[in-house]
């Protein structure tokens, strides 16, 4: 997207907030299944997702941070540029930073789970672009040009007897 391109060509500022337990500043991130930090939630018996238990797990001390700490964290936060070589300022702020009483972490998790459970690509795309504030990327297979080149075939230069035209592409 144009916005993502503009952000990539900026100093890429993210709002970093201090952990109420260890004090280390970090940007809020979506936890995901492969990370041991970030926005997460508990599962109940039988692996049932419990979005109402949403919390943030510190990237550094791994403490569970309840949403009630978010206001004091936000007040002590600061914008930090990841790419200081650029003069152009760019800001990234996902909805995880919404003030308490607006959009809760539980609502964000619930929306995500509904989009995944329904298998609704439109809902998931909307969630990624509005809640994570990131461009949505379809599952794309990257082609290995070396493998394609290795499979090339060498054809002779003989034109069939009755051939009148040769087309190559």
What do the predicted segments below correspond to?
Residues 1-147, 152-169:
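Short, flexible loop motifs at catalytic/binding sites
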């Amino acid at each position: 997207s144009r916005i993502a391109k503009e952000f990539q060509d900026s100093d890429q500022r993210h709002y970093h907030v201090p952990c109420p337990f260890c004090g280390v500043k970090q940007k809020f991130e979506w936890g995901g299944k492969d990370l041991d930090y970030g926005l997460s939630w508990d599962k109940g018996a039988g692996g049932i997702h419990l979005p109402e238990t949403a919390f943030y797990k510190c990237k550094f001390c791994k403490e569970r941070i309840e949403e009630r700490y978010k206001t004091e964290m936000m007040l002590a936060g600061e914008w930090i540029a990841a790419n200081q070589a650029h003069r152009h300022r760019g800001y990234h702020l996902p909805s995880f930073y919404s003030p308490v009483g607006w959009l809760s972490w539980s609502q964000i998790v619930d929306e995500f789970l509904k989009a995944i459970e329904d298998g609704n690509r439109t809902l998931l795309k909307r969630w990624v672009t509005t809640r994570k504030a990131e461009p949505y990327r379809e599952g794309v297979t990257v082609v290995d040009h070396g493998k394609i080149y290795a499979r090339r075939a060498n054809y002779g230069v003989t034109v069939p007897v009755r051939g009148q035209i040769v087309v190559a592409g």
